[in-house]
Amino acid sequence: DFDITTLDQLVDEFDRFEQVTLGEVEAPETERERAARVYPFVVDAVRPERVRIAYTFAAVLGMTDDTDLRETMARRSGHIPEGTPEWAVADALDRVPLARNWAVRTDNAYNYRLAETLPAVEFDDDTTAALADLADRIEADDPDDEALQEAIYGTARDHGVDVGDFFTAGYRLFLDEDQGPRLGPFLAALDSAFVVRRLRLEG
């Protein structure tokens, strides 16, 4: 039987193969020549403007059914560059339901749903203050994924909140779960105004 657990790795291999064909990554000449011969047979048309969303990130996008939010997240994360043709945007986002099905069928680390309304949560005063502080930092700096990941650690320490508990608070707020994907990159991809409101427990 075909094991779909590592399907994301197979898709990553195809994406790299495509990038080699289009000269987007370095590769030995023999690999480039082989890719150039084979590639036209595995796509409907050779279109250099085509955009691919990493399969695991497509699974993250699948945590919401809001198609506009999916596109916003893909753009904010850099998976859809500025100037991408509309057909290429639609083509890239077609990968999302496939990745969502993969996450659900394998019940892997991406099998979560974005809580689109504020879950019923209660935090102690220190955690609530830390969440509000993190909201202020995001509102002021709009950090990228790694900077936000570090800000989460730093904010927890600044307020004397256990780091693990602070991450759990974040997952409860945004996924209504106790765990989930890397929180910084996940929040960085969301609309910052939405993230700020949720961290302030406003909706």
Where are these regions (language model features)?
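C-terminal accessory/binding modules appended to enzymatic or scaffolding proteins
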Residues: 123-171
